[in-house]
A protein has these predicted regions:
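Hydrophobic ligand-binding cavity/cleft-lining segments
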Residues: 1-36
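Intrinsic-disorder/low-complexity, polar/charged segments enriched in Ser/Thr/Lys/Arg/Asp/Glu/Gln
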Residues: 3-7, 51, 64, 79, ...
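Generic structural detector for well-ordered beta-strands
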Residues: 7-11, 46, 55, 83
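Alpha-helical scaffold segments that form or flank carboxylate-/histidine-based iron centers
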Residues: 12, 44-48, 109
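Hydrophobic pocket/interface hotspot
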Residues: 17-18, 27, 45, 56, ...
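Residues that scaffold the ATP/ADP-binding catalytic core of kinase and kinase-like folds
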Residues: 20, 30, 68, 105, ...
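Glycine-rich portal/gate segments that line the openings of hydrophobic small-molecule binding cavities
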Residues: 28-32, 37-73, 79
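Beta-strand/loop substructures that line and gate deep hydrophobic ligand-binding cavities in soluble
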Residues: 72-117, 121-122, 131
Length: 131
């Protein structure tokens, strides 16, 4: 099992990033797929037509999100933590992402997925929104 940690800078405020990560209607806008999401601890979530699913563990509005992602055949908790901070540039947000207990065989795909499908999609969404 491996851990992935990376910082991403998004061109918007922490409250807008939090909304984009927790509101199912906003998630559908940047992913292009329906989403099931709630900010209730212990609620189930589903993204990208069920390709990503798990349980919401903890929320600190506009600051932190903790989720347990499910991997087929893996019983260990795979914890994803998003920590939101004011970014270095005015009006931006630094997102500290930590994803623990990634199965070795899935690690490269997960790294690519975080960059390409998750955070590049969010950056594109906020850049288009700002135009």
């Amino acid at each position: 099992m491996k851990t992935f940690k990376k910082y991403y800078e998004l061109p918007t405020s922490p409250d807008q990033v939090y909304l984009a990560l927790t509101n199912p209607n906003t998630i559908a806008l940047w992913t292009g797929s329906p989403a099931e999401m709630s900010t209730e601890p212990n609620s189930e979530f589903s993204l990208w037509d069920g390709d990503i699913c798990g349980k919401n563990v903890e929320f600190e509005e506009n600051k932190k999100i903790v989720q347990n992602w499910y991997f087929e055949g893996i019983t260990d908790d795979s914890i994803v933590t998003f920590k939101l901070h004011e970014g270095k540039r005015a009006g931006s947000t630094s997102v500290e992402l930590t994803h623990t207990n990634i199965p070795d065989d899935d690690y490269e795909d997960m790294m690519h997925g975080w960059d390409e499908y998750y955070f590049n999609a969010l950056i594109d969404f906020f850049e288009e929104e700002g135009e």
